[in-house]
């Protein structure tokens, strides 16, 4: 995370070379996502390369005006899990989870269950944290302005 958006704004420093890009993995994963989309299996998708999972999920929630309930894996470092800008990684929204799982296994694409969308206007994390969609929108829309004014 030494060259991530998180590192830039939180620790105020960047360090080291960025990780090497695995172009084969990028292509394979991208083709998988497109194939699922073209076959009507994905309602929405967002890569996590700019800000990490939590930023991508927030953007999806704001665009769809939906909430979400997500599972924070036990033992996972919250900073890395929420803000790690992993390559070849996407958040997808689907109502056809079993078919996505089957296709990911056949294509040898790793898949993790993050949670589910919700009609509640909030992000609920399994560790007990809850933030309203209104507050997320405010943070998202004014965050850069606040950072630049400091």
Predicted features by range, described:
Residues 15-18, 28-30, 34-150:
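Glycine-/charge-enriched secondary-structure boundary and capping motifs
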Residues 1-18:
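Short, acidic (Asp/Glu-rich) active-site segment that either coordinates a divalent metal cofactor
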């Amino acid at each position: 995370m030494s060259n991530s958006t998180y590192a830039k704004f939180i620790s105020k420093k960047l360090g080291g070379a960025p990780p090497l890009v695995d172009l084969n993995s990028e292509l394979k994963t991208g083709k998988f996502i497109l194939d699922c989309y073209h076959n009507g299996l994905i309602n929405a998708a967002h890569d996590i390369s700019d800000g990490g999972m939590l930023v991508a999920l927030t953007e999806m929630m704001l665009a769809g005006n939906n909430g979400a309930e997500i599972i924070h894996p036990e033992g996972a470092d919250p900073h890395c899990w929420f803000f790690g800008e992993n390559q070849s990684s996407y958040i997808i929204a689907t109502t056809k989870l079993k078919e996505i799982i089957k296709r990911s296994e056949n294509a040898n694409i790793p898949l993790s269950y993050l949670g589910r969308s919700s009609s509640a206007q909030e992000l609920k994390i399994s560790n007990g944290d809850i933030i309203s969609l209104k507050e997320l929108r405010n943070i998202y829309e004014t965050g850069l302005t606040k950072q630049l004014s400091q």
